[in-house]
Amino acid sequence: MANSRRVSRVSSLIKREVSQMLLFDIKDDRVGAGMVSVTDVDLSGDLQHAKIFVSIYGTEEAKVETMEGLKSSEGYVRKELAQRIRLRRAPEVRFFEDHGIERGDKMLHLLNEIRETIPPEDESYNTED
């Protein structure tokens, strides 16, 4: 089993390489339907399984289409990782959509709505001392 520093280094290397593949190598038109970025790679301790989290900007239709394209390219990505990264065995790759940015945006929107409902002259909500 690899130590945590090695897992972290290999994860960041996989993230960089997959990002490059998304930009230049994966030719599936479905992947280009939405703007895709790799947000995180969760690598198992034995370096055999990689969960790749992606953020997709676009319509719901484009997101679904992009995820289908990514799922179909998992074998290609694994093969490319085996060639680009020196590991005994290339990890099994799975893509997952990361909804963190959407949730964060929704939370900011809700906080802004709450701020707008508080009257400006109300001193009870003033956080300055």
From Swiss-Prot:
Answer whether the UniProt record assigns the keyword Cytoplasm to this protein.
Answer: yes
Q: Which PROSITE patterns match?
A: RBFA (PS01319)
Q: Which SUPFAM superfamilies match?
A: Ribosome-binding factor A, RbfA
Does the record carry Kinase as a key word? no
One protein family per Pfam:
RBFA
What's one GO-annotated cellular component?
Answer: cytosol
Q: Which UniProt keywords apply?
A: Cytoplasm, Ribosome biogenesis
Cell compartments where the protein resides: Cytoplasm
Report a single Gene Ontology molecular function.
ribosomal small subunit binding
Q: Which GO terms describe its biological process?
A: maturation of SSU-rRNA
Report disulfide bridges, numbered on this chain.
Answer: none
Q: What is its main location?
A: cytoplasm
Q: Which domain of life is it from?
A: Bacteria
Functionally, this protein is described as follows: One of several proteins that assist in the late maturation steps of the functional core of the 30S ribosomal subunit. Associates with free 30S ribosomal subunits (but not with 30S subunits that are part of 70S ribosomes or polysomes). Required for efficient processing of 16S rRNA. May interact with the 5'-terminal helix region of 16S rRNA.
Quaternary state and interactors: Monomer. Binds 30S ribosomal subunits, but not 50S ribosomal subunits or 70S ribosomes.
The cross-references to NCBIfam families, in alphabetical order and at most eight, read: rbfA
For this chain, the family text in UniProt reads: Belongs to the RbfA family.
Q: What is this protein called?
A: Ribosome-binding factor A
Recorded name of the encoding gene: rbfA
